[in-house]
Amino acid sequence: EPYRRQRQMCIRDSFQLDSFDKGDYNKAVEQENLARNLVEVLYPNDNHIQGKELRLKQQYFFVSASVQRALARYKKHHDDIHKLPEKVTFQLNDTHPTVTVAELMRILLDEEGLSWDEAWEITTKTCAYTNHTIMAEALEKWPIEIFSRLLPRIYQIVEEINRRFILQIQAEFPGDNGKVARMAIVYDGQVKMAHLAIAAGYSVNGVAKLHTEILKNEQLHDFYELFPQKFNNKTNGITQRRFLMHGDPLLSLIHISEPTRP
């Protein structure tokens, strides 16, 4: 029977016994406490710098763990990393896991030894993006200073993706500097995660017909002009009757069958 796994990512034990034996009890648990902060409470208030940094650390921790786990499972059964898109899709549900794009590129480049073009071809066939909002202010952005300081290698990769993406925009819309400014992934001191997801994803979907039309014609119109083939609608939600029929047909029969009479 088909089923879904839900994984719980945890930190390694980072208790420093040497520091404890020397009487430095605070230092002994310092790293453990810092690491535990990543998984204790998700989505901290990001109105201050500490909250922003913790949120980005959390996002990268869960993304990296998930991507590494997926690739390890793939390589356990398959030898050719180039065929990854035939077996794996990373669904970027809103912008929070969008750093997946750069993390996958990092692994393919630095650990698998692929060229940029090879890694990018695999990544763009493996990642798909779901947008949940038409409000521009809700599309996640990170200050370059924080992003580059906490994730230096990831930022290097994002910069190169941005450089190549800008060249693609300029080739398609020559002389339109306004479009470059609106679509760039790294611009005006910010790393724009939705732009990264659209540039790298093979699919960009809204969650209702009207929502998707607004994305195509208004909010993400520049991207729709460049990538019309990527945009599609996937209506969010499912009725409880359909869910039960598909999820547990035998149980559904109990609910729809005629009641027995004495």
Pin down the residues of each PLM region.
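Single conserved hydrophobic/aromatic residue that forms the stacking wall/gate
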Residues: 1-7, 11, 254-262
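Gly/Pro-rich turn-and-neighbor structural signature
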Residues: 4-8, 12, 18, 44-202, ...
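Compact, glycine/acidic-enriched structural inserts
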Residues: 20-27, 32
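Catalytic alpha/beta active-site cores
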Residues: 24, 36-40, 105
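Residues forming anionic-ligand binding surfaces in small-molecule and nucleic-acid pockets
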Residues: 30-50
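Short, well-ordered coil loops that connect the C-terminus of an alpha-helix to the N-terminus
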Residues: 114, 228-229, 262
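Segments forming glycine/polar-rich beta-alpha architectures that bind adenosine-containing cofactors
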Residues: 205-253
